[in-house]
Regions:
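Walker A/P-loop nucleotide-binding motif
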Residues: 1-12
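Generic detector of contiguous secondary-structure segments
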Residues: 11-15, 46
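Short glycine-rich substrate-engagement loop in P-loop NTPases that contacts/grips substrate
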Residues: 20-57
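Walker B motif beta-strand of ABC-family P-loop ATPases
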Residues: 60
Length: 142
């Protein structure tokens, strides 16, 4: 958890790249993109069950931008299903969010937060300022 630009995605990418180099599968998906994929299921694309199976097959799933939409009930159900299935299968899931613990608890519910803390799951605070202003390729050249 942490504000924008604090390195949450950077750390998740480093972990993912390390796993990929060892032959593991990794999927990083934003919640808005995931919910778009779920809506596409209703329009006759992939079945929702098949989508959930795909999300549960990868060795590491990272859910990004959790809580950015302040969770509809449908979003809560999907996230609950994904997290529940992955943890029941002993497969890790990373959650990246700008929300603090209490805000995420409100967005996802106590059941999901409790499950995420099972088997050594931990909350990591990125409690420093944004680093983006220091990144040269993002600066405007005049």
């Amino acid at each position: 958890s942490g504000g924008p630009g604090t390195g949450k995605n950077h750390l998740a990418a480093a972990i993912g790249n390390h796993l990929l180099s060892g032959g593991h599968s990794v999927l990083v998906v934003t919640i808005p993109d995931l919910m778009l994929r779920v809506r596409e299921c209703y329009d006759g694309g992939q079945s929702e069950a098949s989508l959930l199976d795909d999300l549960c097959k990868v060795d590491l799933l990272v859910l990004d931008e959790v809580g950015i939409q302040r969770g509809s009930s449908g979003e809560k159900v999907i996230l609950n299903q994904v997290i529940d299935r992955r943890l029941s299968s002993m497969r890790p899931v990373g959650v990246l969010t700008n929300l603090n613990h209490d805000e995420l608890l409100g967005a996802l519910g106590a059941r999901v937060i409790d499950r995420l803390q099972m088997d050594g799951g931990m909350w990591v605070n990125f409690d420093w300022g944004s680093y983006r202003k220091n990144v040269s390729h993002l600066r405007i050249v005049k």
